[in-house]
Amino acid sequence: MIRLAKSSDKYHILKFCKNTFSWGDYIQDVWDHWLSEGNLLVIEKTNPIGVCHAVFSKNQVWIEGIRINSDFKRQHLASNLISKVESLAIQKQIPISLMLIDTENTPSLLMAQNLGYKINQTWKFYSLSPRENPSYEISYEKIIQNNNLSHYVKSWRWIPLDNDTISSLNSKNCIVQSKIEKDPAIAILGDSEHFEKTLIVTLFAGSKNNTMNIISFLQNFGFEKKYQRLQILTKETLPEFRDLEHKISFHLMQKLLS
């Protein structure tokens, strides 16, 4: 049975969400946030054995945090959770479903493709250590809709950069550009809604010099604002830079629901 999660499910869910990745898992850090946001679904057989979270917006549903107890693998439980979210999205007349999958997670990629998802884009996740670095030249500027700027990342959710979203970002003055030469680099800055002292950056790389210039700014910005973590999401391979480390790459998977 699939149902909305409740507070008492947390104990059962976290028991099998400890070693999902080599470094552990993040579900314990976001559970309370997701529960309060709503649309946190569990699948149960006596006790909860699977979970996922859905975020519905005007034109898309974002599916995240799919976890299945390893004792119940190969029973299509993840597929059932995804199909449930899709049915809710269709009821809301939402046309697109999106999710993020590690490029090396072949079983999950095959499952998504069997459900009709296709690779829409590939993104790379870099971490950057905050450090005093005053050698940069950037400007806070507004942007306009551009086919090359398709999405930005808000708390690890990919949001389409439509006119309304761009207008909101412009009004918050959270877009920086490096234009020291042709082919500018653009970064959209945002605080994580789930992790303290974490800056999430969507970076649209430009020329090598512009890109390194904006990374220098981000490093110094993180130092000045006392961030503990700088997380950069980009579609490009970034140049080598001190304290910049590529962590993982993801496929942005998309399915048209109508």
Q: Which residues does each PLM region occupy?
A:
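Conserved active-site alpha-helix within GNAT-family acetyltransferase domains
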Residues: 79, 103-121, 235-248
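Conserved acetyl-CoA binding element of GNAT-fold acetyltransferases
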Residues: 60-70, 194-208
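Helix-loop element at the rim of GNAT/NAT acetyltransferase active sites that forms part
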Residues: 15-27, 149-160
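Amide-forming acyltransferase catalytic core, primarily the GNAT-like/NAT-type
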Residues: 115-195
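Conserved GNAT acetyl-CoA-binding A-motif
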Residues: 82, 88-104, 111, 223-235
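Conserved beta-strand in the GNAT
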Residues: 47-55, 62, 182-193
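Conserved acetyl-CoA-binding loop-helix of GNAT-fold acetyltransferases
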Residues: 68, 74-88, 110, 114, ...
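Short hydrophobic/aromatic beta-strand element in the GNAT-like acyltransferase core
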Residues: 38-42, 51, 172-179
